[in-house]
Each structure stands twice: as structure tokens, then as C-alpha cells.
């Protein structure tokens, strides 16, 4: 990819604006793939989460979510089950199902997150669990 030319199909994570997702603590996300590249049915996000931080209880009505661990360790909780995850592990959060994700490692966790259909950090597509 030519560094001086913008492309609709190729994305460099360092060039994507960061944001702090709702119902998460100590988390910085970068939306790598979404409608800005023409994706209509999938969204891919790179998340970096600090130790002891992560996703508070919430669900995504009508949206499935997959988390793939790149670095660090975290505990995922969904459907009454919990599992500690490390690099190369992944978890699935079904649509409408409350879930929690908490980093256990000293170093930040880097997580590739996939949503289908796209979530686009839309509050109308999230259900907080209090």
C-alpha cells in the first residue's frame, strides 16, 4: 500500500481515530472496518484495555460480537459461564445476551472485536445491565 495515497480498502490502525466506548472503563477503541470503507454487514474494532478494566455488564440487541485476544489476558462472562482468555483465544457474545469482559494481565490487553451487523457505537444498539 502506498503510504501517501488514501485507500478505501486498506486501513492502518495508527491512522484511525481513537474513541472511548460507552459502558467500558480504561478502554480505547479504533474502528478499523466499518461503513467508512463500505462494509455493510460487519464491523471490526481494535480495543486496548488496561488491567482491571473492560466492559461493564451490557448487551447488544440484534448484534453478535466476537472478541479475539491478540495480547494480554482477560475474563469473559456470558450466559452464566466465565472463561479466562489469552492470546489466540476468542469468545462469542450472542445478540441480546448480557456480557462482561475484564482484563486480568498486568499489561494492557489488545483485542480484535467483530460485530455483525455493525454496531458503530450507537447507543440505540446497546442495552445497559444495571
List each model region and its residues:
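Short, charged/polar surface micro-motifs in flexible loops or helix N-caps
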Residues: 37-40, 49-53, 73, 82, ...
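A short hydrophobic beta-strand segment most commonly corresponding to one strand
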Residues: 46, 92, 107-122
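Short, conserved beta-strand element in jelly-roll/cupin
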Residues: 48-50, 59-76, 114
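Tight coil/turn sites that cap or link beta-strands
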Residues: 51-52, 88, 96, 106
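A short, N-terminal "cap"/entry segment at the start of jelly-roll beta-barrel domains
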Residues: 1-41, 124-130
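Short acidic-glycine-tyrosine-enriched beta hairpin
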Residues: 80-95
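Short beta-strand His + acidic residue motifs that chelate non-heme Fe in jelly-roll/DSBH
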Residues: 56-58, 76-77, 93, 99-106
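Conserved short histidine dyad/triad with adjacent acidic residue
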Residues: 29-31, 45-60
